[in-house]
Amino acid sequence: MISPSNNCLRRLGGAGLLLLLLGACGILDTTREARPAFYSLYGARPGAISSIAAPRSISAPTLIVNPPHAAPGFDSHRIIYVREPHQLEYFARSEWIDTPARMIAPSIVAALENTSAFRAVVMTPSVAAGDLRLDVEILRLQHEFGSAPSHVRFTLRAYLVDNETRQVLAWQEFDETVAAEQDAPYGGVVAANRAVQNVMERLASFCAKAAGIWAPADSKRHKAGELPLSGQSMANPN
């Protein structure tokens, strides 16, 4: 015969086992935890600046684009926001799908190709040889909450270099601020994409104009009289 005390112990043991199983299910069920949201960054708007560029020609320079890099603090997947000057913070559950520098690289190439100012635009690493080289750096990409509405600020510095002479032909710093439609990570992401698109258009226009005044080193030496032009002799005609 089973005593009432034994029945009570069995019931308590069964209840304890059930609680343990429920606890284990809770640990394994990760759907209850807030998962991070991942966002992308696209900068090229095809057709936006093609009207400003000269038709593509075989004599146009080939442009080599080095992979963009970013200033410290802006070289990760984290989406940065600022509430106080000089203090960078990041959203806990919102991230870029890749680093901003890697995400904007295809957009830079697309925007430059759209100008038709270059014979070809090539992203390194590549075995292709180029006449000009473009180096870019992201100085900041941050969601700023210091005023209402909040806004995203994107700053990019670019150098256009003559590959043969290693001379900097032109450089410029591009700074864009776009208001966010909402004070939330997604609002900042939308504003960031618009800011990057604006900078890509300005960057492409800058490079196209600089390429328009570029001349190969040999051509410059011909004009300066350092080398004879075709059909001329270096000997004294007298």
Task: Give the ranges of each region predicted by the language model.
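Surface-exposed short loop/turn segments
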Residues: G26-G47, T115-T165, E181, L229-P237
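C-terminal motif of bacterial Sec signal peptides marking the signal peptidase cleavage site
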Residues: L21-A24
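Envelope-exposed proteins and targeting segments
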Residues: S59-P61, D75-H77, E84, A92, ...
